[in-house]
Regions:
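Transmembrane alpha-helical segments of polytopic membrane transport and secretion proteins
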Residues: 1-46, 321-336
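Periplasmic/extracellular loop-to-transmembrane helix junction in inner-membrane transport proteins
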Residues: 23-41, 60-106, 126-127, 180, ...
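Membrane-interfacial helix termini and adjacent extracytoplasmic/periplasmic loops
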Residues: 70-93, 148-196, 276-278
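Hydrophobic alpha-helical transmembrane segments of multipass integral membrane proteins
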Residues: 97, 101-109, 113, 117, ...
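Transmembrane-helix boundary motif in ABC transporter permease subunits
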Residues: 106-137, 321-330
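Transmembrane alpha-helices
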Residues: 136-139, 143, 202-209, 213, ...
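C-terminal transmembrane helix and the adjacent membrane-cytosol boundary/short C-terminal tail
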Residues: 207-211, 215, 222, 290-336
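Glycine-rich helix-loop "coupling/hinge" segments at transmembrane-helix boundaries
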Residues: 252-297
Length: 336
C-alpha cells in the first residue's frame, strides 16, 4: 500500500469542542428570519392569550364591584334576587346550589357510561362497529345546545312523568325524590339533559386516552394469564386515570356553563327545593340568559357579578383537575 493510501485511511485528528462563545455565535447565525418571525408569533400568541384572560377577569371584577358595593344583602348567601328595589337585595345562593346540583347529577350519570363506551370501542367492539359508533359520538358532540334544549323540552320532559312517578312511589320517603305531580321541569331533568350533552365529550377524550395504552402492558398481563377484564382493570384504567379525569373536568366545564339547553328545559324559580323532582331552581348561566336583556344597567352589573362567580368556579375546577392529574401522574403513566 502506497503512502497516499495510508494517509487516506487514517482517521482525522480529533477537534476540540466548541467553546460557549462559539456556540452562541453559531446559534445566532443559524437563526433565520423565518425562525425569528415564528418565535415572535408564538410568543405573542401566548401573551395575547394571557392578556385576553386578564381583560375578561378585569371587566367582570370591575362591573361586579359596582353592583356588590350597593347590595343590601349578603351576595354569597342571600336567597333572593331583587335588583329593582332601593336598596337592592340579591345573592347567588340559589344559583350556586342549582348549578352544583345539576352538574353533579350530570357527572354521576355521564362519567361511568362514557368510560364504559370508551372501553367498549377500544377493547371489546368488533372492528365493523367501531367506526359507526365513533361517528355517532362525534356527531352528538357537534349538536348545538339549542337543539338539545328543544329536544329536551319537547321529547325528554314529557317522558319524565313515568320516571318521576316511580321515584316518588319507591323513594319519595327520602324527600329528595318526592314529587307533587307538577311539570317535570326540574333539576333532575336538567341533570339528565346535561349528562346526554357531556357524554360524547368525555367519551371521545377517554377513548383517545385508552388507545395510547402501550401494547406491551396489555400483552404482559395476558401472558400472566389475566382475563380481558383484568387487563382493563390492571393496565388500561390505571394508565388512563389522569386522562379520564381531564375528560371529566372538560365535561364538567360545559355542564357548569351550559345556558340555552337549561333555560329551555328548566322552569325558573328563585328558590331551593329539597326534592330534585319538583320544578324550580336556577343556574348561573340560565339566570343571566333569561334576565340580561330586560335588566337595567344596575341589574346587568348584578348579573355580571354572578358571572364572575361562575368564572372563578370554572378556574378552580380546572385548577383542581390539574392538581389531581399531577399527583396521579406517577401512578398512571399518562401525560397530564
Amino acid at each position: 500500500m502506497d503512502i497516499s493510501t495510508q494517509k487516506t485511511d487514517q482517521a482525522p485528528p480529533p477537534t476540540a469542542p466548541p467553546t460557549a462563545t462559539e456556540q452562541k455565535r453559531a446559534a445566532r447565525g443559524a437563526t433565520r428570519p423565518g425562525d425569528r418571525i415564528f418565535l415572535g408569533l408564538s410568543r405573542g400568541s401566548g401573551i395575547l392569550l394571557l392578556a385576553i384572560m386578564a381583560a375578561i377577569a378585569g371587566f367582570l371584577a370591575y362591573r361586579a364591584s359596582l353592583a356588590i358595593s350597593k347590595d343590601d344583602a349578603n351576595f354569597l348567601t342571600a336567597f333572593e334576587w331583587n335588583t329593582g328595589v332601593i336598596p337592592p337585595k340579591f345573592g347567588i345562593a340559589v344559583l350556586a346550589f342549582g348549578t352544583v346540583v345539576s352538574s353533579v347529577i350530570a357527572m354521576v350519570l355521564a362519567v361511568p357510561i362514557a368510560v364504559a363506551i370508551a372501553l367498549f370501542l377500544t377493547h371489546y367492539a368488533p372492528r365493523r362497529l367501531r367506526s359507526p359508533i365513533s361517528y355517532v359520538i362525534d356527531l352528538l358532540a357537534a349538536v348545538p345546545s339549542i337543539v338539545y334544549g328543544l329536544w329536551g323540552a319537547l321529547i325528554l320532559v314529557p317522558q319524565m312523568d313515568g320516571l318521576f312517578g316511580w321515584l316518588d312511589e319507591y323513594l319519595g320517603w327520602t324527600g329528595i325524590f318526592s314529587w307533587d305531580q307538577g311539570a317535570p321541569r326540574s333539576m333532575l331533568t336538567v341533570g339528565i339533559l346535561l349528562a346526554i350533552m357531556i357524554l360524547p365529550i368525555i367519551t371521545n377524550v377517554s377513548r383517545e386516552v385508552f388507545r395510547q395504552v402501550p401494547q406491551m402492558h396489555e400483552e404482559a398481563a395476558l401472558a400472566l394469564g389475566a382475563t380481558r377484564w383484568e387487563v382493563v382493570r390492571m393496565s388500561v384504567l390505571p394508565f388512563g386515570r389522569s386522562g379520564v379525569i381531564s375528560a371529566s373536568m372538560l365535561g364538567l366545564g360545559r355542564a357548569l356553563g351550559e345556558t340555552m339547553a337549561v333555560a329551555t328545559v328548566l322552569s325558573p324559580d328563585f328558590d331551593i327545593h329539597a326534592s330534585l323532582l319538583n320544578p324550580g331552581g336556577g343556574t348561573f348561566a340560565q339566570n343571566i340568559a333569561s334576565k340580561f336583556n330586560e335588566a337595567s344597567e344596575f341589574g346587568r352589573d348584578a348579573l355580571i357579578a354572578s358571572g364572575l362567580v361562575l368564572f372563578v368556579i370554572t378556574l378552580l375546577v380546572n385548577g383542581a383537575a390539574r392538581a389531581i392529574i399531577a399527583r396521579r401522574k406517577e401512578y398512571s403513566g399518562a401525560n397530564a
